[in-house]
């Protein structure tokens, strides 16, 4: 079917309209369409994609450019220069029976009906038409395929083999997709070079039983994998995570997303709406977003940066998933863990800023602004006590109120991990060993200083009290924070400031982390990236924001990340492959 669509698109795009018409085409499509695809224009997408790849890597652009231009050249030679310039939209229904191809139609904003028919037929003269009712006509192209076409007002719709969607469009539906879509869904569909709309509720209604059967099979496979690897705790966490995704699909109404190719970055933006009677939608009535500008004060040099603005229920859900991977049987298998989870509902809303890195151990610097400071500080103490009971912890000590610095009353928690128990049945897996060793360090230990000043809670891993002081000082030195870095500014300028969760990944630190893991897997020292890897910090990341009708998701990959991957990660991977092949 996709090959048919491609052929039709190539043959039918024979004129250009003076303005962006994709929004107008939405007014021609039935509101209950299952899937809609919207393309800005083949020539524009080709130019944007080639420009983005070249900005990320002249090598990548040089490899992709000729192939893209060749395709455009072939289309131009066969169908004319206008063939590549017009935007188009594809509307699709769900199949009516198993094995039946879905009915769909291509819509293009062109008024020269006869020229389009000649291109579709592959003939010099317009094909002989036969009326099939409702203003729809059919003809046979030179390869013997039946084509159905409709000459609309300022647009043309056509399809192959099935006239169902073309007839629905020709009937001028009273309820159209254009009138159905909210502003957020419309922007998500049309905001980039390539957009998709999916009627999730219709798909769930049609295939709900099959989806539920897939869920049961998938969960059973996770249980089996957990038993075989003796990692049931991690599998329980995975089951909760994927189970939540299956549940979300049941409550979802519509999804729209777009991909945008720009010289400055690759952008993905999506919006998911929920059913009006769904519990998830009811929970969003009191949802609040927060401003992520505080991330700018965090110091550079970390692998991961994160902002979160969460209500107690959401925080409890996150901690419950963490407990599933930390304790056998999850929180229910640890009274202390369950007690801590129960206390989460009393803490109120929390905003947190976190910087974290791996490699030689976990290094964390976090600042939390809680609604209830005293309860949150007490909960942090209880969390450290609870973690000490995890089978993965060999030794643990907690010293309360060991120091006061800049108003923060600091506690000290020290833990030594049981490397073998963390690996479980994966003790003989070099990749697993490399991952764990990178996280816990050579001495398998970590020390965290944490406490509040009555307004906010700070947490910092450090080998000494003096180092903890230095990290706390970094939080107040905004002139030295990542906010001054071009890589941070490039990322944040393309993400919404008001959000519930935002993450940013340091590309250089990611390359070094991967090099450390692969070096361990190969039985040697960490593999350092080549000296010519760019040193200017490049960040990529994304965000998730609640909305009264659903959720907005954004992801940004700035072009500056490309040279880091090309000159840093690619040589490391190639070096490992060379060792394996020797």
What spans do the regions from the language model cover?
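Bacterial N-terminal signal peptides
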Residues: 1-12
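Structural boundary/hinge residues at secondary-structure and domain interfaces
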Residues: 16-143, 182-362, 368, 374-412, ...
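Short, solvent-exposed coil/turn segments at beta-strand boundaries
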Residues: 30-31, 101, 150-156, 265, ...
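Long compositionally biased, domain-poor regions of proteins
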Residues: 81-93, 339-363, 373-374, 386, ...
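A conserved glycine-rich beta-strand in the N-terminal activation segment of trypsin-fold
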Residues: 140-219, 440-530, 534
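Composition- and surface-driven signal marking solvent-exposed, interaction-prone regions
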Residues: 170-172, 271-273, 282-287, 320-321, ...
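A cross-kingdom marker for long, charged
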Residues: 288-292, 451-453, 539-582
